[in-house]
Amino acid sequence: MAHHAAQGDYVACVVLTHGARVHDKVISDSMFHRERVPTGDELLEMMTQRSDVKAEEVRKACGILGFQDVYFFGEDDAVLLMTDDNVRRLAAMIRLRKPDIVLTHFPREGDAFSNPHAIAGQITMYAISYAASVDPADANPPHRVAQVFFFGTGAAATRHQLWDAEGGYYNDVFIDITDVIERKLAAMDCLVSQGYGGAYARKRIETSDGAFGQAGGVSYGEGFISLYAETHYLLPVTDYALKRARSSDHEIMAGYSYRIKAD
C-alpha cells in the first residue's frame, strides 16, 4: 500500500469490525484473569471507548503508510457473519470508490466458517460480485474489480491445525517491501491496544515478512494469492526474475540478507 500511495494511486482501507473483543489490551487481555467482568451497559461503554482507541491507532498507522481514507463499518466481532446488510454496504463502497484492486483475507482461512478473517474475505467476495450489478438503494453505477489479492499470511502460512490439511494454496505474488520496512514497523508500533507494537512487531516482521522476502529473493516481502489468472500479449518475466537469473549464489543470498535494526 505504501508503494501505491507513493506513486499517486488512490488507497483506502475498510475495517469491518470494531475489534474491541479481540486482542484488546483492556477488554480481552486484562479481563482474562479476573474473577468477574463488567456486563450490560458498563461493558458496552468500555467496548465503545476501546474501539475508538483502536480506530485512532489504525488512522495513525495508515497515515504513516501514506493514505488517509479509512472507513469503519463497526460490525460487532462477537459472531461475525456474512449478512445481506454488510454485503450490500461494502458493495456500495466499492461502487463509490471504484477500486481496480482489492486486498482481503483468504475466504477459506482456518476452518472457513468460524474464522473472522475467512468471514471477512467471504463478505468481500460477495460484495465484489454484487458491486458489479445495480442496487435499487444505490445511485452509483455497477463497478467491476480488475483483480483481487488475498493476504498470504493466513492462507499460505505454516500448517498447524486440522483445517490446514485442506491446504494446497501458495503465494503466487511477492511484493518487495524492503525499502518501506521501517515505515511498516512504525505503523505496527501504532497498534498498541492490539498488542502489535514493540517486540511483537519486530518478531512478526522478521518471521513473516522476512520469510516472504527470502522466498521472493529480497530481504522483506509480502506474499499474496491472486484470484484471477493474468492475460498477457507476451510471456511475462519480471525485473526481479531477470536479476536473479543473472546473479551468483552469493549475490542472491546477499539480496535477502539485509536485516532491519531492532531497537
Where do the PLM segments sit?
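Active-site rim/loop-helix segments in enzyme catalytic domains that contact anionic ligands
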Residues: M1-R97
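Metal-dependent de-N-acetylase/amidase catalytic core
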Residues: H3, D76, L80-D263
